[in-house]
From Swiss-Prot:
Name of the featured protein: Transcription elongation factor GreA
Signal peptide segment: none
Role summary: Necessary for efficient RNA polymerase transcription elongation past template-encoded arresting sites. The arresting sites in DNA have the property of trapping a certain fraction of elongating RNA polymerases that pass through, resulting in locked ternary complexes. Cleavage of the nascent transcript by cleavage factors such as GreA or GreB allows the resumption of elongation from the new 3'terminus. GreA releases sequences of 2 to 3 nucleotides.
The keyword Ribosomal protein appears for this protein: no
MF terms (GO), sorted A to Z: DNA binding; RNA polymerase binding
Biological-process GO terms, alphabetical: DNA-templated transcription elongation; regulation of DNA-templated transcription elongation
Length: 158
């Protein structure tokens, strides 16, 4: 499996979720299964089957997070050499030349992306189009909504 780029904050969020799943959610589900078993016949015991389904989801998510963390390439953006180019983890301000509006994005890992908070995934069309470019560059990016022309205004290593 390839390394998965992730910011320090993204790795911390996954560790927090993993801790919650292992130390809170998993024991809670085990208690629910034990309680449901006390109701008797397991074939027609909806509570038991629901708890077992929750257990499957929980264990699957635990494995997924552990795999991501074991393959994570954790990047501390504040320690990157400011090359003046757009790279993973930077905050980049662009002018959308189609609508003449300034937008600011931070390029993060897939699990960290949240477009409402201007956190865009490294694998998104916008991030892929901006990676490697520098201040002043004009970039034409194909998005699901059509082509958008951006000019890079500022690159910050925050």
């Amino acid at each position: 499996m390839n390394q998965i780029p992730m910011t320090l904050r993204g790795a911390e969020q996954l560790r927090e979720e993993l801790n919650y799943l292992k130390n809170v959610r998993r024991p809670e589900i085990i208690r629910n299964i034990a309680e449901a078993r006390e109701y008797g016949d397991l074939k027609e015991n909806a509570e038991y089957h629901a708890a077992r389904e929750q257990q499957g989801f929980c264990e699957g998510r635990i494995q997924e997070i552990e795999s991501k963390l074991s393959h994570a390439q954790i990047i501390d953006v504040t320690k990157l050499f400011p090359s003046g180019k757009v790279v993973f983890g930077v905050t980049v301000s662009v002018q959308n030349l189609n609508i003449n509006e300034e937008q600011t994005y931070r390029i993060v890992g897939d699990d960290e992306a949240n477009f409402k908070h201007n956190l865009i995934s490294i694998s998104s069309p916008i991030a892929r189009g901006l990676i490697g470019k520098k201040k002043g560059d004009i970039v034409l990016i194909k998005t699901p909504r059509g082509e958008v022309k951006y000019q890079i205004l500022k690159i910050e290593y925050l």
